Amino acid sequence: MSNSMHRRDFLKSMAATGTVAMTSLPVLGATIPHSLAAGCKFFTVSQAALVESISELMIPADQFPGGKTAGVVFYIDGVLAGPFGKFYRNRYEEGLLRVDAASQKQFGGCFVSQDSDRQTAILKDLQSSDAAGSPDQEFFGLLWRHIMEGYYGDPEHGGNRDGASWKMIGFEG
């Protein structure tokens, strides 16, 4: 079974439970694209790389662009940088810290440096280890919603670059 299939299975399981995961922290030894450094208003470069990594894990590229190519991280960054993002900022900062801490504990490295199988394991462990209503459950649900909004929403809000998901579903815009 390919990594793409594992990611699709993970995406389906998270959608079924209404939860998902997200992360951020130091990106040890990872190469950060210049576009992340230049394009974010709220996220640090390492946080943006983590969110981008999770968005690609949740919506992997196949014949259509994945979360990374669609620019989901820029949509989420815009939400958090805007006036209505105040309520979510602390949740993202703490949630991303927990994801990266779990990666450090399980595999001795930051989340973005792990392969997709390890990333999936980290997110599944965090999602399933807590009771309903826990901070991780709430964060994963928030992240999932924002990833979906960033992927399928209006490109003018920073995600869905070039209307990629709209083209996928045949929406003319």
What label would you give each PLM region?
Residues 3-9, 22-58:
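C-terminal segment of N-terminal export signals and the immediately downstream linker at the start
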Residues 49-53, 64, 71-173:
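Mature-region segments of soluble proteins
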Residues 40-44, 61-66, 85:
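Short, N-terminal intrinsically disordered low-complexity segments that are rich in Pro/Gly
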Residues 15:
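Aromatic-residue-lined binding/catalytic grooves and analogous aromatic/hydrophobic interfacial grooves
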Residues 1-2, 110:
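Short N-terminal micro-motifs specific to bacterial/archaeal maturation
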